[in-house]
A protein has these predicted regions:
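DUTPase catalytic domain/fold
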Residues: 2-156
Length: 156
């Protein structure tokens, strides 16, 4: 579907990407409406992830996430459902001032070993706006009907 710079959309932007390894693959979108850009494994040799274990999978890329946004690294649904592989921290957060390599901590939630190959799509990157409000200490909060009810308090 093409690289980040080829997209058309409401919030069209470009992201500077630096290849840290010659064989790294730039992120791509799987369809014209995809929210997440696929991130690819950049490996010198296949990596086997044993059941219940986590492996750090490099992408061979670093990026300039625009100020006022963050990059969120999510699981790819097919990889999670078919092979039980998903980011260990569920959602990785890439801050706009981070300039290091994008690495996916991929966890094997299944009962069988899984092998990741170079060029395999291992996660997806979603760019989203970020708000950084000031936190103000107060003596009391405004009352609401829900109040402090949580964990199922609004219904079954």
């Amino acid at each position: 579907m093409g690289g980040l710079a080829e997209r058309k959309g409401i919030a069209n932007m470009n992201i500077n990407v630096k290849k840290l390894k010659e064989n790294a693959i730039l992120p791509t979108y799987g369809s014209s409406g995809a929210a997440g850009a696929d991130l690819y494994a950049c490996l010198d040799a296949p990596v086997t992830i044993e059941p219940g274990k986590t492996a750090f999978i490099p992408t061979g890329l670093s990026m300039e996430i625009p100020e006022g946004t963050a990059g969120l690294i999510y699981a790819r649904s097919g990889l999670a459902c078919k092979r039980d592989l998903a980011p260990a921290n569920k959602v990785g957060v890439i801050d706009s001032d981070y300039r290091g390599e994008f690495i996916v901590a991929l966890h094997n939630h299944g009962a069988q070993s899984q092998t990741v190959e170079h060029g395999e799509r291992v996660a997806q990157l979603v760019i989203t706006p970020v708000y950084t409000p000031a936190f103000i200490e107060v003596e009391a909060l405004t009352d609401t009907q829900r109040a402090a009810g949580g964990f199922g308090s609004t219904g079954k």
